[in-house]
Design a protein with these regions (language model features):
Chain B
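An alpha-helical appendage that flanks or caps ligand/catalytic pockets
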Residues: 120-158, 199-296, 328-332
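Acidic (Asp/Glu)-rich catalytic clusters
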Residues: 31-32, 57-66, 88, 92-98, ...
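N-terminal small/glycine-rich loop or linker at the start of catalytic domains
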Residues: 1-14, 108-111, 150-165, 258-271
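Active-site mouth loops of central-metabolism enzymes
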Residues: 7-20, 74-82, 165-175, 269-279
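N-terminal beta1-alpha1-beta2 module of alpha/beta enzyme domains
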Residues: 1-70, 167, 332
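Internal, glycine-rich beta/alpha segment that forms the wall or movable "lid"
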Residues: 80-188, 199-206, 213-215
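Conserved, mostly hydrophobic/aromatic
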Residues: 3, 30, 34, 42, ...
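Hydrophobic faces of well-ordered beta-strands that scaffold small-molecule active sites
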Residues: 3-7, 38-40, 69-71, 99-103, ...
Length: 219, 332
């Protein structure tokens, strides 16, 4: 059976990811801040087929939970409901937009390692290095020459594989990285990967130039 | 169809004094050339000269006759709606009823620290303040208001009143769907910022109209406008080449281009929809916004990236004399 997906965050990124998840045939729930009627309208227009829920309910019934809220509001994520799920961090820290957030300032680790520590659950980093318009525009079937790649960085091999399968089903070539901290090269300002919309071959050669080896297991 | 320009007063290498003088002169030209709107934004950073657009709009009002005086956007989350209303009501009186406000949350966050607001509150700050501003704009009499984000008002008279019966307050939307719901529920006109492909904004426009209908607003009172970066040259290739260095520098503020915007990415943005090109290309792209989104106004950011005034003036002239008349005719 297909993994059930929950997207926490119904903003620019969250609505696109929910739409891609529905298109990939995954049972998809989506949660947002604000009142349920507004969420219902947004989902009906932007991600029809996804089921609007509260964050806690959405996470509790899912196998994979994609967190796509502004980092400044990470505390609104129901951390307890994430236990036992595969949790994906699709977020980025960029102070001109997020404001300066002390937890992420001077962070030498990947921002996902800080997210992991704050949420208290293992996380996988993916979807963060492509813009929401591009995520929407670049979905392609497997084997298409134009297909773009999304890196999937994590510590837990099974979790990375589960997210890689979802990435593939959504229309992107997954490139697994281990450990989670290797995903630092996917972040804004740290390499030529963020926002570059690379194919798998281009992403692999960029990673190679950065001295980052992809993880062996590739679905 | 209304056509206009907007600016943040990008500094480039110019002095603030020179940039402000250029802006007033460009607005005067836009008025004489028949453009409908000049809108000024605010950024609270050294690379932009405009943090107090209402003062510059007041200077512009004194040297123009017809052009509407708007914002792009007024960062309402960190302003006092009472003061904003007073300033724009005053501008409206000075200008003979030409003032408008486009209220938004802004792209940057500096104003939160400068004016003592907590960025984590940005949602409630914008929501409460927008509602209060709309109340002030729509209701003639004394206002009583309670909320979290400023001191209460008890039968407060906010004066002067605008010259227009209702001072227009648009809601500026950058792509967040909740913002389109808000604009629709409040029955306010919506301005959507679009830089590349306008197609994804169709969903925002649908959400806006449906939210307005659910709240019982008359569809006749709804309006959608769009705007984004714009450069018009005599030829397609010439426009691209002239504008590229300034745009690449400007977009290095974005995280994906912090090392500079590659030419290939720039060309891709133009292909996707960025309004850079010959007059005919810009006409086609504005008409595409109109077809996809039903806009009744387009405003282009016409002085991006600290271009020399001569380049800005030339692009502005082409927009006013070769783009605007054709768009008006095709959309009539």
């Amino acid at each position: 059976m297909s993994a059930r997906v929950a997207v926490l965050g119904a903003g620019k990124v969250g609505t696109v990811l929910a739409r891609l998840s529905v298109a990939a045939g995954r049972p998809t729930a989506i949660a947002g801040s604000g009142d349920p009627a507004a969420l219902g309208l947004i989902v009906d227009v932007l991600a029809p087929g996804a089921v609007p829920m509260t964050g806690a309910d959405a996470a509790a019934q899912a196998d994979i939970v994609i967190v796509a809220v502004p980092l400044a509001r990470l505390e609104t994520v129901p951390a307890a409901a994430l236990k036992g799920r595969v949790v994906v961090d699709a977020m980025n820290y960029w102070p001109p937009v997020d404001g300066v957030l002390p937890a992420w300032e001077d962070a030498t680790p990947s921002s996902s390692e800080i997210v992991r520590d704050l949420l208290g659950v293992d996380v996988v980093k993916s979807f963060n290095h492509m813009g929401y318009h591009e995520l929407d525009a670049w979905t392609r079937p497997a084997g298409d020459l134009d297909r773009r790649a999304l890196a999937v960085a994590g510590d837990d091999g099974a979790a990375v594989t589960a997210v890689a399968e979802l990435v593939d089903a959504m229309g992107f070539d997954p490139v697994p990285l281990r450990p989670l901290g290797a995903g630092r090269v996917l972040q804004p300002g740290s390499s030529d990967i963020f926002g570059a919309d690379l194919t798998r071959a281009e992403l692999l050669s960029t990673l190679d130039a950065l001295g980052v080896a992809p993880a062996a297991a590739c679905p | 169809m209304e056509l206009g320009i907007y600016s943040f007063g990008d500094s480039g290498t110019h002095s603030t004094r020179q940039r402000l003088a250029d802006l007033v002169a460009q607005a005067r030209y836009a008025d004489e050339a028949g453009l409908d709107v000049i809108a000024l934004g605010e950024h609270h950073r050294p690379d932009f000269t405009l943090s107090a657009p209402e003062l510059v709009l007041a200077a512009i009002s004194a040297v123009t006759e017809r052009i509407r005086l708007s914002t792009a956007v007024t960062v309402l989350s960190t302003a006092d709606p009472v003061r904003v209303y007073q300033q724009f009501a005053t501008l409206d009186q000075l200008s003979g009823g030409r003032a408008e406000i486009v209220a938004g949350r802004g792209a940057f966050t500096e104003s939160f620290g400068l004016f003592g607001y907590d960025l984590r509150e940005y949602e409630v700050l914008f929501d409460e303040k927008l509602r209060l501003l709309l109340t002030l704009a729509r209701e003639e009499g004394p206002v009583t208001w309670r909320g979290r984000t400023r001191e209460p008002l008890d039968d407060a008279l906010v004066t002067p009143r605008a010259l227009q019966p209702v001072l227009p307050v648009w809601v500026g939307v950058g792509g967040t769907p909740q913002s389109a719901v808000r604009a629709g529920r409040l029955g306010a006109p919506m301005f959507v910022a679009i830089f590349t492909d306008p197609a994804p904004a169709r969903g925002l426009v649908e959400i806006y109209h449906r939210a307005a209908a659910n709240a019982g607003h008359d569809p006749a009172g709804l309006r959608v406008a769009s705007g984004g970066h714009m450069y018009v040259g005599h030829t397609s290739q010439g426009a691209r080449d002239e504008f590229y260095p300034y745009y690449a520098e400007y977009l290095s503020k974005l995280p994906q281009f912090s090392g500079g915007m590659p030419r290939a990415a720039y060309d891709e943005w133009i292909r996707a929809g960025l309004l850079v090109g010959s007059p005919q290309e810009v006409i086609d792209k504005i008409m595409n916004h109109r077809e996809l989104l039903g806009i009744s106004r387009y405003v282009g950011q016409f002085d991006v990236g600290g271009m020399p005034a001569g380049m800005v003036d030339k692009s502005l002239e082409l927009f006013a004399t070769e783009v605007a008349p054709v768009v008006r005719k095709e959309s009539a």
